[in-house]
Amino acid sequence: VISYYCCYNCYWLINNNMHFTKKSSYEKRIELRNKLKKQKILKFPGAYNPLTAKLIFEIGFDGVYISGAVMANDLGIPDIGITTLKEVSYRANQIARISDLPSIVDADTGFGNCKKTIETFEDLGLSGCHIEDQIDQKRCGHLDNKEIIPLNKMVDKIKTAVNSKKDNNFLIIARTDANIVEGINKTIERVKAYEDA
């Protein structure tokens, strides 16, 4: 049988099984949970497209991180809370499905609907996401003048996220910007409350 390819890239990708994954989303989540139990540092370089994710896999890292700032920049907009769930989930799905590594995506503040956000990312094969405690018109983590929501509102948001997942192995990661706004003691209080939620 003679195969014809449109270019060398197609030939290489097909003959090196670069478009097939061997692990299901569930298996990737279990693998991540097991690695976390070992309490060792895991390396999750950021991927901005599927090819980068494939390189991360080929090099042998532990997982793939999908940054909200990178998604915003890829769309040509600043990382100030104006990307949508549709935009981020589309690219996150492309990245997550290309390798056998678990993928964690930045869910910003939950895109206005934590339940829908978690269900979407879980259905698209992500291994987890992180949600931050800034107001919806958030600012990228390294920018000044951030505002955070009240502690009880963030706890409610985390509970909604946790209750929305179908697979208990899907990770919900809470992220805080409280240190800059409220100081270290309030930050520790928030982190403990988030963990309990």
Q: For each predicted feature, which ranges?
A:
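Short, proline-centered helix/strand-breaking motifs
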Residues: D100-P102
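Alpha/beta enzyme core
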Residues: R29, L42-F44, Y48-D79, T83-I98, ...
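Extreme N-terminal cap/leader segments of soluble proteins
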Residues: M18-P50
